[in-house]
UniProtKB/Swiss-Prot annotation:
Residues 1-12, 77-95, 156-165 are lumenal. V-ATPase is a heteromultimeric enzyme composed of a peripheral catalytic V1 complex (components A to H) attached to an integral membrane V0 proton pore complex (components: a, c, c'', d and e). The proteolipid components c and c'' are present as a hexameric ring that forms the proton-conducting pore. Belongs to the V-ATPase proteolipid subunit family. It is found in: Vacuole membrane. One of its GO terms (molecular function) is proton-transporting ATPase activity, rotational mechanism. Its main location: membrane. This is V-type proton ATPase subunit c2. Proton-conducting pore forming subunit of the membrane integral V0 complex of vacuolar ATPase. V-ATPase is responsible for acidifying a variety of intracellular compartments in eukaryotic cells. The chain crosses the membrane at residues 13-33, 56-76, 96-117, 130-155. Keywords: Hydrogen ion transport, Ion transport, Membrane, Transmembrane, Transmembrane helix, Transport, Vacuole. It is a multi-pass membrane protein. Residues 34-55, 118-129 are cytoplasmic.
Length: 165
């Protein structure tokens, strides 16, 4: 049976690989950040239970990283529609690089948030003045994932520009 696909037959593989990479790596970063900072919150809560709700900020910030990967994965997967238009290797590579940019940025941000969150909430239990400093460092770590999201959106928008229509 002949394929009705117009474009390069292997290109969608790279596009879908980019969508998977965005979601998998971002969720790995979110999981690591949530687990690492959650351990810090749990051990800090034994000493100072009144600070538990204030100390879940790193856990929430780490959880947001998975949403960034989901956004890029949805953008990429909606851009892969071989029946609507041809899909070339340039498009697949653009989507792959988009997914890797967002996913790996989310992974590294999750690692930073987890480490800073763990140490920060434990230190906050000993010295409450450190809370603002911890939040600022967490914001800078979260910005790393935002950079990946922005670059991922820009790279994903490049798909489809390899041909004159």
């Amino acid at each position: 049976m002949a394929s009705t696909f117009s474009g390069d037959e292997t290109a969608p593989f790279f596009g879908f690989l980019g969508a998977a990479a965005a979601l998998v790596f971002s969720c790995m970063g979110a999981a690591y950040g949530t687990a690492k900072s959650g351990v810090g919150v749990a051990s800090m809560g034994v000493m100072r239970p009144e600070l538990v709700m204030k100390s879940i900020v790193p856990v929430v910030m780490a959880g947001v990283l998975g949403i960034y990967g989901l956004i890029i994965a949805v953008i990429i997967s909606t851009g892969i529609n071989p029946k609507a238009k041809s899909y070339y290797l340039f498009d697949g590579y653009a989507h792959l690089s988009s997914g890797l940019a967002c996913g790996l940025a989310g992974l590294s941000a999750g690692m930073a948030i987890g480490i800073v969150g763990d140490a920060g909430v434990r230190a906050n239990a000993q010295q409450p003045k450190l809370f603002v400093g911890m939040i600022l460092i967490l914001i800078f770590a979260e910005a790393l994932a935002l950079y990946g999201l922005i670059v991922g959106i820009i790279l994903s928008s490049r798909a489809g520009q390899s041909r004159a229509e």
